Amino acid sequence: MAQKLITFAVPCYNSAAYMRHCIETLLSAGEQAEIILVDDGSTKDDTPAICDEYAAKYPTIVKAIHQENGGHGEGVNQGIRNATGLYYKVVDSDDWLDEAALRTVLAKLNTLTARGTAPDLMICNYVYEHVEDNPSHTVRYTNVFPQNRLFNWTHVGHFRPDQNLLMHSVMYRTQVLRDCGMVLPKHTFYVDNIFVYQPLPFVKSMYYMDLDLYRYFIGRADQSVNESVMVKRVDQQLRVTRHMIDCQDLDALKGQKKLRSYMLHYLSMMMAISDIFLLLDGSAAAKQKENELWAYLKAHTSAGVYRSIRYGFGGVTNLKIPKGDKLVLGGYRLAQKIFKFN
């Protein structure tokens, strides 16, 4: 049997209210796709039964995997372990893909694969779909990447603060994910940051299509990117940030200037996000955690990497000046209004 072009992994946890819409959009890819529905120990609704229903109805496309609760990261790990597709994409069960854009992307991947030029990373736009006031905001990369051709990091332009690669914008070759040895931590939110960071040094070729493929549903009260939820789960944000500090030696990338610069920028952003949510907590314990995180960065990276982050973007949120915390939070609120990120 011919290899599937792409594996979609859909981690599902008590997702019965919205997962069908997600799955139906993925089914539009037809037989060239494999859809792995990972039921992450759901107990409160019909998620397990819905997974089994689709697996029975589409046996050549859909696999249902039931696991003990391990969190979103273990759902992604489970998908990688079981994937048979050439490419791998994670789609959260409350999100969906634009079907017309998906057909266009898969047609291009088929063409490139037939030529023997399949890229390690396919990149597309993603769209924030806000539940409260229904505006949408598209994140595109037309100023960062060449369009509709193969390229590498030497061809990459400048990323604006709102243009980081996220899980929503990427399709990795499955083998890249296996080669980099990435295993996401269990019972931890925000591991999507590891997913788009750790494999990057293993990516040798990329392709960007200016298509609004991924629709990112944002604004549910229980969502992990909800601000109050992030404050409560800040320890998980810190765990992910430490993992990212440890998983790559950025000094080993000095021969790849643009890749190293981007990864420094991304790690700086993770430090800044951690600082902001510790500031929002405002407790003495949170301040101690902030100091410990910066000490961890200093102890586990070179002096050059530490200085780049401490005195660059990451350090902006750790100002050692009077009323520095208020300035940081004011800047965060302004950015929140501009970029509508949670």
Regions found by a protein language model. Give the residues of each.
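Donor-binding/catalytic cores of nucleotide-activated saccharide
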Residues: 72, 95-206, 214, 218-230
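Membrane-interface aromatic/basic loop that binds lipid-linked glycans or pyrophosphate carriers
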Residues: 279-342
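A conserved acidic beta->alpha catalytic loop
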Residues: 39-49
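Short, acidic, metal-binding catalytic loop of nucleotide-sugar glycosyltransferases
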Residues: 24-33
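Catalytic core of nucleotide-sugar-dependent glycosyltransferases
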Residues: 211-220, 226-254, 269-303
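Glycine-rich, basic loop-to-helix element that forms the pyrophosphate-binding segment
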Residues: 67-83
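Short aromatic/hydrophobic "clamp" motif used to bind/position activated sugar donors
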Residues: 88
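N-proximal low-complexity "stem/linker" segments adjacent to membrane-targeting elements
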Residues: 1-25
